């Protein structure tokens, strides 16, 4: 069996299977003689519940078991690449139908690669499932097969995006697709073509954001999405999910034009969406700049409170923790690299760097990496000579914000820093507020433990918007409950 990273197999708990089938409308007598497929069926978590529901509804209307067997063979379909999971699936389906005294069903479940199957196209009334999550760098031999799909052309793509394209292709007119996948498609570069497709087709019916709740072992934040082919939907319903109680909560009925802001899909109430549109699309004065801190790519070498020398050493703040340390800074105060001769003329520094040389080269030759003794990237070097403010990027509430002044001559790493002439108290009033936390939550960049993160650009846009409108300080952007 392929590794999980290569196969993307993440098996779905039964309660979520039921939720997804309910969202898709696969219940009641309307499911009879309707085609349904799970095109990445694994051991049959969805197909087992589908068979159970079909048998239950059929037997309410007829006791003709021969016809029921024929229906199960005709209307229920599956695809699974892994032969072990495929055999488990067939066994599990046979176990289900044995309860109804059915035997030797000719299951239309195929042990093959869904990427190459086309004969289900335009035939399915329902496409459901939990498609595999595999990042592009883990696709191994499947890379070329995945990259020829339209939805996988941008960014660090993922296999589940190809399955969206496959699923849409399988639907008949009026057919419904309901997947649970990573929620990253709403805001990632990789998901941009899918978002454009949704804007054109207006086929989105429901979005259910599981937010911080993670039903799978895999480190992914997920979302249930329902689409309908051939029927234009002017709006869709956005829901959230109470994970520990398995309850779907309705939040807002929204238009796709409202939630698409700069080719990113945001999920929020209408007032928040309006505020986000003002922040991201309006032009504001450049009052602050927000940048990423040092990226030495070898913090364990360059940063330590106990460096065995004092030359070319500066104070450095770890923005993520608010703790100060010391950094070997082989640059001028303006961030220009010192020459090899200058750096290695100090015996203690020379011995220290030579001792860590193999680690800094990271398997490369000195010829290929002649400046191995410098930081891995140049970001933040030229701002050491400036006053600035450091801030962490992973927060859960205002108390978790770490904001500190960093004077000229000191550096910042593991977080962001702000360049501005605005006074510290004003910045604190903007950042240490529930309004700012509401903004961060609305970005939906989830981190484990209920935390959120944000980018340098998102922080810069927010602060500039607030400062540009500071004279109207009585107006709050985000509603605070």
Regions found by a protein language model. Give the residues of each.
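Polybasic, glycine- and aromatic-enriched phosphate-binding surface used to engage nucleic acids
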Residues: 277-481
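Conserved SAM-binding strand-loop segment of SAM-dependent methyltransferases
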Residues: 103-114
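Signature of N6-adenine DNA methyltransferases within the class I
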Residues: 5-6, 10-19, 40-48, 55, ...
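Short, solvent-exposed loop/turn segments at the edges of secondary structure
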Residues: 71, 218-222, 411-413
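Conserved beta-strand segments of alpha/beta enzyme cores
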Residues: 75, 106-108, 203-206
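A short alpha->loop->secondary-structure connector
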Residues: 96-103, 197, 201
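Conserved acidic residues
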Residues: 34, 74, 125, 205, ...
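Class I S-adenosyl-L-methionine
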Residues: 1-71, 77-95, 113-118, 131, ...
